[in-house]
Amino acid sequence: MAEVNLENVEKRFGETWAVAGIDLTVHDQEFVILVGPSGCGKTTTLRMIAGLEDVSAGDIRIGGRSVVNLPPRDRDIAMVFQSYALYPHMDVYRNMAFSLQLRRVPKKEIDRRVNEVAEILGLTPQLKRKPRQLSGGQRQRVAVGAALCRQSGVLLFDEPLSNLDAKLRVHMRTELKRLHQKVRSTMVYVTHDQVEAMTMGDRIVIMNGGKIMQVATPLEAYDKPKNRFVAGFIGTPPMNFFSGEWVDSKVQLGGGVKLPYPRSSPNGTKSVVFGIRPEHIYVRPSGNKGETAVPSVIEVVEPLGHDVVATASCGAGVFQLAAEIHDGLKPQDKLDLQFDMARAYLFDRDTECVL
Amino acid sequence: MGFWHRIRGHVTSWAFLVPFLAFALFPFYWAIITSFKADANLYDLRRNPFWFAKTDAVTHQPYHKDIIVPASYPAAPIHWEIKQGDHTTRSDSEANPKPIARIGDQVVYSPVDGTLSQIEVPEGSTARPVDVIGTIEVENPTVTHYKFLASTPFYRWMQVSLLTGLAVVILTVLIAVPAAYALARLKFHGNRVIGIAIFLTYLIPPTILFIPFSQFVGALHVDNTIWSLILSYPTFTIPFCTWLLMGFFRSVPKEIEERALLDGATRMQMLRLVVIPVVLPGILTAAIFAFTLSFQEYVYGLTFISSTANRTLPVGISVEMVRGDVYFWGPLMASAVLGSLPVVIVYGLSLDYFISGMTTGAVK
């Protein structure tokens, strides 16, 4: 059992708050992703779990045991660093066996585990090589392998894929997911890439400014963002935002654009931010209820293959929409775009919370 | 296109390199050829600093060396003889040189086992001490100067220098490595100031420090012993090597230290198993610098040591091989060449370490 509990954990560097009091429970064998922009405190949180940073306040428990006063080596964790952190003077075998040798695991057992992990990761031919003789992808796998050999309860990943090229990154994403299903360790994974977060995590923790903005499954984070930050962070291309006023079940945006907003909302007038994802703006009516036509002009079209990201403008401002290449959008096209109001969001302009 | 285009890069780099090489290597060239030149060639000014010559620049005669009646021989006129067949023989081995001339019952040997040209002394003539009784064609190049060193305490000085260097290296590495790691990695109050202060101590010249140091040396009763040097040399090797090593320790990726801690290492294990092996090229570099610095040190060696037998090589050479204003250039240069050999050997053996970047592959 390796459940990780964070209770009101804080981290201060002098006067600045890196982590401003977070609570989080990572269940046993869960794959949790900490995601957020740089400087949001996700890496600091991970390093506090690892014991590489002291906590300024709060408590961290691993498997029910408080670890804030334990050195890293006694926390039953292994970590994969962004830069891989391989020992340059040791070959791949020793890199993977090092932690076991320090723990005086019997030689036979070390041999068995290293060979097993090397087999899983396809590193068997490289066992006698030094890190400098390996490609970036191989080094990355050695780093993961070294962490796996430990068979620790918790595995921590600090942006392990960010130094790989795009193609390899997609491949390793799948590999890591498969690996998690195989080893069933608790995994905490830090990334700034929301695609990585969405594709890999059982749950994702979206952080900003040292605070947790939302903890949710990928689907929840996409469908039910708690606030404007999460809504804008999750999804590519990002959600479009317009500021406006909510008056009598209608959202009034700039330029005289008026949209009916069907969901129950506070009464009276309120300053709001209206948000809608590019993929919920349609080129032609689908017949769904709650669609509203907004006269717009296409400005830029960026074909990605089957999908096209188009930038358009309406009276309320500039926004992006996702279309298909066969929709035949061209710059300067004037047309009524359908806003799917059933899938749009309203945020309080002051608190930025969803209404 | 074609030839010039292809070699243009080489031409440019050699154009930059050649002046540097000429500047850096010329002293070595001069020292080496001087150490092998026969004196006659060496003092033939028009032949200096050029390659070995066979003939005198003015007379165009082969270089000769006079054979002189030893000064130790009784001053009175003496009868001497050359036995037939002696004067043109060449000594076949050093162990059994053939006599080339006899003065009374004393035998004058060929001073070098080179070719013997002529001894033109009429039978029955008399010769006094320091009289020239013949000439001998000199061997050029020659190893005479190197052989001469065996009759001086040269090898003793070499031993003292090597021993001092080795002890200083060990002491320096033992102290500088932990100090440099602490200054480079550990966060404590004032580590920047201490780092700079350590470097500043290196900048104070030994010519200022040797007087106060001699007080310490006297108080410790180590004057005129090798210990006075072993204890005083680290005062400049440790600051220098600490400063040098700080850079190497800083270049060790922090992540591999952190990973070692996570892998279950204590701080000492992390240092011993991860950090030290990774900075080994740096430690080797520091050791070589410490050795070179102590090997070439002059002021402390000159002032703390007074007996000939305990001198270091640079001091011994300059004190014992220069008499008044007479410089024994041949032996001086021979000892300079031999004296630079240990450093050359040490550098040569560790060249691979300097060149190979050991940390490649650690991160990214």
Model-derived features with residue positions:
Chain B
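A structural signal for multi-pass alpha-helical bundles of membrane permease subunits
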Residues: G2-S93, K98-K364
